[in-house]
Amino acid sequence: MNGPQRSLPSFTGLQVVHDARLGFSILIPDGWQRLDVSDSSADFYAPDPADLLTGLAVEGRDLGTEVQPGDLATLRRGFLRGLRELAGSKVESREAEAVGRLISLEARHTFRDGDVIRKRWVRLLYQGRAQVRLIAQAATVEQFDYWEPMFYTAIRTAHFGTFT
C-alpha cells in the first residue's frame, strides 16, 4: 500500500426525520446536530456544530401549484441555471428524471466562495405541490470527499412517505 490511507467516517446509526406536513422522510447520521439556519426555513444537520460550512440542509415547501412530469425540462433548465449563477461554478455531474408523479433533479458541483473552492451535492424532489431541497456541502472539496458516504446515505434515502 502506497502512502497513508485516510479513514472514512463511521456510522453509529441513523435517525429518521419525517416532515408530516409535506409527507417526506430522510435518514440523517446519528450524532449530527440539528441547527437552525437564520433567514431560512431549512434545517441544517452538521457533524460538527462548530463548522457551519459542512453538513446537510433539508428544506421542504408547498409550492402552491401541482408539479407534473411534463415540467421536467423546464425545472431542469432552471435548476442548472441557478447552479451556474454561483461564482466559478463547475457542474461535475447532473441527473434528472420523472418516475410516475415523482420528479428528481440532482447535481454535484464546485463553486468559489471567496478564496475557497467548495463542493455541493444538490437534490430536488417534487411530488404534487411539494418540493424537497437537499444540499450536502463541505467547507472544502477534501472535506466533501471525506463526508461523502454520509451525504450519500442521507441524499439517497430522502423520499415521500415514511420508513416502515
For each feature predicted by the language model, list its residue ranges.
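Conserved polar/disulfide-associated segments of primarily extracytoplasmic proteins
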Residues: 1-11, 34-133
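Proline-anchored loop/turn motifs at beta-strand termini and strand-loop-strand connectors
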Residues: 21-39
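Short beta-strand segments and strand-loop junctions that repeat across beta-rich extracellular domains
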Residues: 23-28, 57-59, 159
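Short aromatic-glycine motifs in intrinsically disordered, low-complexity regions
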Residues: 14-27, 147
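Surface-exposed amphipathic alpha-helical segments
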Residues: 32, 132-164
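Generic detection of long, well-ordered alpha-helical segments
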Residues: 22, 69-73, 144-148
